[in-house]
């Protein structure tokens, strides 16, 4: 968890955007729409819920941090987390979500390693 904190100090956008970009690409919507201040069509809402879930569980972000990143309140973030957890009851979706979490965690680790290499030079 400490590594996620150090990244937020050095390059907040490098890590924060991983969940949104991944969820948007998988669902097929523009990533910029995930933080739009208005309600969106169901496809965008589902992508946002997935992004919130990935940001929270794959990157270890707090509910408050997720709320700030996606321009939502904490209750909405908790609702998104619950909806995706329910969707994970479907084995196919669960497999997909697990792979997305692993991919985002791997990207985070790669970015952290590059930061560490740069700091060592």
Residue ranges of each PLM-predicted region?
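Short, Lys/Arg-enriched anionic-surface-contact patches
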Residues: 25-48
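Short alpha-helical "recognition helix" segments of helix-turn-helix
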Residues: 23, 64-70
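Short, amphipathic alpha-helical "recognition" segments used to contact nucleic acids or chromatin
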Residues: 45-60
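DNA major-groove recognition helix of helix-turn-helix
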Residues: 56, 80-81, 88
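General nucleic-acid-binding
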Residues: 1-21, 113-121
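Helix-turn-helix DNA-binding helix
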Residues: 76-78
């Amino acid at each position: 968890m400490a590594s996620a904190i150090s990244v937020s100090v050095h390059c907040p956008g490098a890590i924060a955007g991983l969940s949104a970009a991944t969820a948007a690409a998988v669902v097929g919507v523009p990533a910029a729409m995930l933080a739009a201040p208005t309600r969106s069509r169901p496809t965008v809402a589902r992508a946002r819920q997935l992004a919130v879930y990935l940001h929270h569980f794959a990157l270890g972000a707090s509910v408050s941090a997720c709320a700030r990143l996606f321009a939502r309140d904490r209750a909405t973030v908790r609702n998104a987390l619950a909806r995706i957890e329910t969707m994970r009851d479907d084995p196919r979706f669960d497999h997909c979500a697990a792979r997305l979490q692993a991919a985002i965690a791997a990207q985070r680790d790669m970015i952290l390693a590059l930061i560490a290499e740069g700091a060592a030079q």
